[in-house]
Amino acid sequence: MLKVLFTAAESAPFYKTGGLGDVTYALPKAIKKQGVDIRVAIPFYEKKFPAKYLPKVKDLTHFTLEMDGRPVYVGLKTIKLGDVTYYLIDNRQYFDRDGLYGYWDDGGRFGYFQMAVIEMLQVIEWIPDVIHANDWHTAFIPVLLKEKYGWIKPYQQIKTQLTIHNLQFQGWFPPSTLATVFGIGREGFNDDGFGQDGSINWLKGGINYADLVSTVSPSYAKEIQTPAFGEHLDGTLRKQSGKLVGILNGIDSEVYNPATDQNLAYNYDAKNLAGKAKDKKALQDEMHLPKRTDPLFAMVSRLTRQKGADLLVDALENFLVQNNVQVVVLGTGDQDLEEDLSSLQDRFPGQLAVRIDFDEGLAQRIYAGADYFMMPSAFEPSGLAQMMAMRYGTLPIVHETGGLRDSVLAYNAETGAGDGFSFWDYNAGVLTNILRMAKSVYADQPKVYAKLQQHAMVKDFDWHHSAAEYLKGYQRILGKA
């Protein structure tokens, strides 16, 4: 049986700050169903770990590793969720904090974590065929397997895959950490290794050292090889393009199912949408909006420029003045954008409701109760929210970039094809025009809207499609493809 260790800095349902946490939970579960012995290694953030799962956590063992000439404790716990075993790396000095990231010693914290993940394999006497690393927090594992642990025979056969969920975050650290954190020399500290502009770049190291590099949509895999999206690594990615693939993320069809979702006031499916109309009224109540039949547009997102929140602010004023519509926004993010949206809410009572918060239950009620879901991201490696919205029969309005381009088929008025709306030029005027077009379809062409809604709801984004592609990747690097 193929053995895979999947490792990342976070995983739902224990803790997540974004899409990475969703993927770390859902993808291994789907790969397991393909007949793979896949296990997951994540840090044990004690303060963030949900109390309801603590009784299921078992202490497995403990050992020490060496950092800067001193022994450092590694506690190893385990928990099983469904069919998947999770290993939890425990060290209070590094992980018993109020947040997951953003600390001055993140280099030490995640350097320690990566070494602990590798060294635990001999302790538990389980050597995987593949280690699947994710984002910068674990991207140095392929480097360490060659530069630090290459002399250990069982590790020499391990192949590595690195998945890039967002190229913006790369893990830059001073060269001194090679010695103080990892205890390795500078042999790979160059442009073909992990050196960049006089610093160590963990993600670059992973790209150069991993046997396979994947990212979370085919379009994003192409985009990051260009200067516009490459975040100064486009040259490295072009050089390594032969081992770069794009695999679109999926969603958990069991969790995101309007027929069974317990967060909703009313359940429904594609054959009977009566519950969705009632969910719209329930959402209007919850967000203190008058119950009207006008189209309801929604956005659930981090309120940042990457997510296009600034573009939405610029587009909303004219759109709200000129159209009988309602808009709901849920999210937190940049303070200036939060304030801009709150100010617009004050100016357009009854039309705009803004909730500066993150509430997963409310998010799912928004997917169900809205008519349109806005995702005007400047760039979007994969995106999950547009898939969730479509599953709930809410048509996406997206910027044609990355995974948004790969998952949403824009409405074609001539053929009637499509399951959403999209725009290419990234400016507020174009977004306003596409919002007007969507409003017009809803208000004036209800049969067209209903047809697009059916297209969206039956589109299959289940993780088993992605899992099959990842399995092909594992087989490729093991020479079994």
Swiss-Prot record:
Alphabetical GO biological process terms: glycogen biosynthetic process
A single GO molecular function term of this UniProt record: alpha-1,4-glucan glucosyltransferase (UDP-glucose donor) activity
Catalyzed chemical reaction(s): [(1->4)-alpha-D-glucosyl](n) + ADP-alpha-D-glucose = [(1->4)-alpha-D-glucosyl](n+1) + ADP + H(+)
Pathway: Glycan biosynthesis; glycogen biosynthesis
EC number(s) per entry: 2.4.1.21
Entry similarity comment: Belongs to the glycosyltransferase 1 family. Bacterial/plant glycogen synthase subfamily.
Organism this protein belongs to: Lacticaseibacillus paracasei (strain ATCC 334 / BCRC 17002 / CCUG 31169 / CIP 107868 / KCTC 3260 / NRRL B-441)
Sorted UniProt keywords: Glycogen biosynthesis, Glycosyltransferase, Transferase
Annotated residues for binding of ADP-alpha-D-glucose: 16
Pfam (any one): Glyco_transf_5
PANTHER family with a match to the protein in the record: ALPHA AMYLASE DOMAIN-CONTAINING PROTEIN (PTHR45825:SF11), GRANULE-BOUND STARCH SYNTHASE 1, CHLOROPLASTIC/AMYLOPLASTIC (PTHR45825)
Biological role stated in the UniProt entry: Synthesizes alpha-1,4-glucan chains using ADP-glucose.
Protein name: Glycogen synthase
CDD domains: GT5_Glycogen_synthase_DULL1-like
